[in-house]
Amino acid sequence: MTRVKVCGVTDETDLAAVDAAGADAVGAICDVPVDTPREIPRERARELFAAAPPFLTTTLVTMPDSVDHARDLAREVGPDVLQLHGDFAADDLDSLRATGVGVVPVVDATDLARARDLAPVVDAILVDTPSDSGAGGTGETHDWDASRDLVAAVDAPVILAGGLTPDNVVEAVRTVEPYGVDVASGVEASGGVKDHDAVRAFVAAAKTARGAVDDHEEVVA
């Protein structure tokens, strides 16, 4: 079954909605050099993660300028996982992971060499549509065929992000066959505010999409 992360949560009401919908992970955004209504202060992220139920994985999405910056964030906010935007070397990610926090770097779908280099030292790889600054969260899809090729080539779980919505997530899963999917703007009523009906619809579609893959393969066979 495809795992689901809902990202860019900013308050307890949306956190509860994500949990009630059956998502596997929730993300909050801190310390990013881009203008986004989803960014919240470290203290707020810490409060939200402390309020998360025990089986909902908390993910801090950030773009730190150094490994020390990332360590400080992990120590101060206390997430289960750090999702890192930026050009970090494999050795740096390995040392960060050794502190006990999960590490998920963001990689361009066309950069197979980097994905292969990082795969042995990270918990998963997230493929997103990058902005000019190198951050994700553009709300735009990318070449899913390239993402599918990356899934096949990399020995690590791959999480698909970028422009996903309740309307296209089944097709995305059927095409890419990722370990998980990640959504932010695709389930929002407005910037930084989740549409709870859309959250429920997205999670349900993503969770049943793997059956759609299996059914499709049987028809083709």
From Swiss-Prot:
- Recite the UniProt keywords alphabetically: Amino-acid biosynthesis, Aromatic amino acid biosynthesis, Isomerase, Tryptophan biosynthesis
Which pathway is recorded for this entry? Amino-acid biosynthesis; L-tryptophan biosynthesis; L-tryptophan from chorismate: step 3/5
Under Enzyme Commission nomenclature, its number is 5.3.1.24
Its catalytic activity? N-(5-phospho-beta-D-ribosyl)anthranilate = 1-(2-carboxyphenylamino)-1-deoxy-D-ribulose 5-phosphate
Task: Please verify whether the record's keywords include tRNA-binding.
Answer: no
Any one Gene Ontology molecular-function term assigned to this protein's record: phosphoribosylanthranilate isomerase activity
Q: Which GO terms describe its biological process?
A: L-tryptophan biosynthetic process
Per the record, the similarity remark reads: Belongs to the TrpF family.
Family matches, as PANTHER family:
N-(5'-PHOSPHORIBOSYL)ANTHRANILATE ISOMERASE (PTHR42894:SF1)
> Any idea what this protein is called?
N-(5'-phosphoribosyl)anthranilate isomerase
Organism of derivation: Haloferax volcanii (strain ATCC 29605 / DSM 3757 / JCM 8879 / NBRC 14742 / NCIMB 2012 / VKM B-1768 / DS2) (Halobacterium volcanii)
